[in-house]
A protein has these predicted regions:
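Hydrophobic transmembrane alpha-helices of multi-pass small-molecule transporters
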Residues: 1-42, 193-217
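Juxtamembrane and boundary regions of transmembrane helices in multi-pass small-molecule transporters
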Residues: 2-7, 87, 146-192, 300-332
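Alpha-helical transmembrane segments of integral membrane proteins
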Residues: 7-14, 56, 86-90, 149-157, ...
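Hydrophobic core of alpha-helical transmembrane segments in multi-pass integral membrane proteins
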Residues: 10-26, 62, 162-165, 318-321, ...
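Transmembrane helix exit motif
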Residues: 21-29, 66-72, 162-188, 208, ...
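Membrane-embedded alpha-helical segments and adjacent helix-loop junctions characteristic
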Residues: 30-99, 103-106, 202-259
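Alpha-helical transmembrane segments and their lipid-water interface positions
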Residues: 55, 59, 72, 102-106, ...
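Membrane-interfacial helix-loop connectors
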Residues: 97-156, 235-309
């Protein structure tokens, strides 16, 4: 484990060194008047995305370490109802109470599924955690001038959509879709450490968290780089101009949410800036789709789950969000 962490640390150091050399090298003269301003903006956006996401990723990997060392498969099986319908509801409701963003929730779900949680239950947790947790709903309420309508619609429609997607995943996938095998999560787990003293178990928890952080961190960086590139070099107005009519504007706002990869605790303030330009349905597309799926989150999901599963989940989220919002439009 230490060897792996050290190798990841070397990789991070190498990447950081390359970026520093690129930034400070005096010989760079590629269209300097344009390049310097654009690169400075790119740099600021990239750092802001990392600063937004890192606290939640750190929280996520710490919880992942606790699950790995202190939670056994037997304890986990008692938590999830055997009835699939109840399990779907339970996973979505528990996720809704957990203050995590779409980045921090990925390592937690990977650990839970790896320890024996049904895949569909993990998906329910994955979808509702970043979307309708108390912090997100409160920030939505504040962003729209203390108007409860958008906040309530985000919560209710988001929960309905998450349950629908979870049910479809339950029907489509019966096997574990993690890239790592189940045994990879059981080594040095609670069954082997139950008789060991607490300090030893705490050390194991921290080692697991560090290993998880370096494993997920590089994919967060890749996603943040791509999202920063989009925000810097692609004008938001040019994206919005693509939308025409209710369906078009909703699809454009969903696409914008995917590309911008905003933290779910802050995305409502961006959506509120379009309040007088677009219908509420389109704004809800931005608010619901983004926390479920965005660019940096997709990179992290691809590092954890099999490609076919991630693509299927992407299609299900996109189609379900759009369909439910269009059906609910007369009531919005």
């Amino acid at each position: 484990m230490r060897t792996r962490a050290n190798s990841e640390l070397i990789g991070f150091a190498f990447l950081g060194s390359c970026l520093l050399l690129f930034y400070f090298h005096k010989g760079i003269r590629l269209n300097e008047s344009f390049f310097s301003d654009s690169f400075l903006t790119f740099n600021m956006v990239f750092i802001s995305i990392l600063l937004e996401a890192l606290p939640f990723v750190l929280l996520g990997v710490m919880i992942s370490g606790i699950i790995q060392v202190f939670v056994s498969e037997e304890q986990l099986s008692k938590f999830i109802p055997r009835n699939k319908f109840l399990a779907i509801i339970m996973s979505c409701l528990v996720g809704a109470l957990f203050p995590a963003c779409e980045c921090g929730i990925v390592p937690i779900v990977r650990r839970l599924v790896g320890k024996g949680m049904p895949l569909f239950a993990g998906v329910g947790f994955l979808l509702t955690g970043p979307l309708i947790n108390p912090l997100v709903i409160f920030s939505t309420y504040m962003a729209f001038g203390e108007d409860t309508k958008i906040a309530l619609l985000r919560m209710v429609l988001g929960l309905i959509i998450a349950m629908m997607i979870t049910a479809m995943i339950c029907a489509l996938f019966q096997q574990n879709q993690l890239k790592l095998t189940k045994n990879s999560f059981n080594s040095n787990g609670p069954e082997q450490q139950v008789k060991q003293p607490l300090p030893t178990r705490l050390r194991a928890m921290i080692e697991h968290a560090i290993d998880e952080f370096f494993d997920m961190g590089k994919f967060l960086i890749i996603g943040a780089v791509l999202a920063a590139f989009v925000q810097t070099f692609i004008a938001t107005k040019s994206i919005l101009d693509l939308g025409n009519g209710l369906v078009g504007s909703t699809l454009v706002m969903m696409g914008l949410a995917y590309l911008l990869s905003l933290c779910s605790e802050a995305d409502a303030f961006i959506a509120a800036s379009f309040d007088h330009l677009l219908p509420k349905t389109s704004l809800l597309g931005f608010l619901i789709y983004g926390p479920m799926l965005d660019l940096k989150n997709t990179i992290m999901l691809l590092s954890v789950f099999k490609f076919r599963f991630v693509m299927t989940l992407t299609i299900l989220i996109t189609v379900t969000v759009l369909a439910v919002l269009l059906l609910a439009h007369p009531m919005i």
